[in-house]
Curated annotation (Swiss-Prot):
Subcellular location: Cytoplasm
Lineage per the UniProt record: Eukaryota, Viridiplantae, Streptophyta, Embryophyta, Tracheophyta
Biological role stated in the UniProt entry: Acts as a sulfur carrier required for 2-thiolation of mcm(5)S(2)U at tRNA wobble positions of cytosolic tRNA(Lys), tRNA(Glu) and tRNA(Gln). Serves as sulfur donor in tRNA 2-thiolation reaction by being thiocarboxylated (-COSH) at its C-terminus by MOCS3. The sulfur is then transferred to tRNA to form 2-thiolation of mcm(5)S(2)U. Also acts as a ubiquitin-like protein (UBL) that is covalently conjugated via an isopeptide bond to lysine residues of target proteins.
Protein name: Ubiquitin-related modifier 1 homolog 1
Main location: cytoplasm
Keywords for this protein: Cytoplasm, Isopeptide bond, tRNA processing, Ubl conjugation pathway
Cross-link (Glycyl lysine isopeptide (Gly-Lys) (interchain with K-? in acceptor proteins)), chain numbering: 101
SUPFAM superfamilies: MoaD/ThiS
Entry similarity comment: Belongs to the URM1 family.
Modified residues (1-thioglycine): 101
Length: 101
């Protein structure tokens, strides 16, 4: 499954300072594309893209409070959060809304 993942608001620093990642994600064994959800994607991101301080991006199985998640420009809170189904060629954006001052 081909996806575009974008990180902003400082989260790109956790991914070798790259903001945009075009990735190929393998489906879990026995899963079809209708079964691939944000929960699976977040696990994949933690394992394959986050290079340092994963606790700044995730808390448990989900993103930390203060991280805005958009799936194809739609807030994931409107589409089921962890249960949001991810499809081929989707664009998923993670933006930290927490800033120092």
């Amino acid at each position: 499954m081909q996806l575009t993942l974008e990180f902003g608001g400082g989260l790109e620093l956790l991914c070798d300072s790259e903001k945009i990642h075009k990735v190929n994600v393998d489906l879990p064994n026995g899963a079809d594309s209708d079964d691939f959800t944000m929960k699976h994607l977040l696990s994949w991101v933690r394992t394959n893209l986050i290079k340092e301080r994963p606790e700044m991006f995730m808390k448990g199985d989900t993103v930390r409070p203060g991280v805005l998640v958009l799936v194809n420009d739609c807030d994931w809170e409107l589409s089921g959060q962890l249960d949001t189904v991810i499809e081929d060629k989707d664009v998923v954006v993670f933006i930290s809304t927490l800033h120092g001052g």
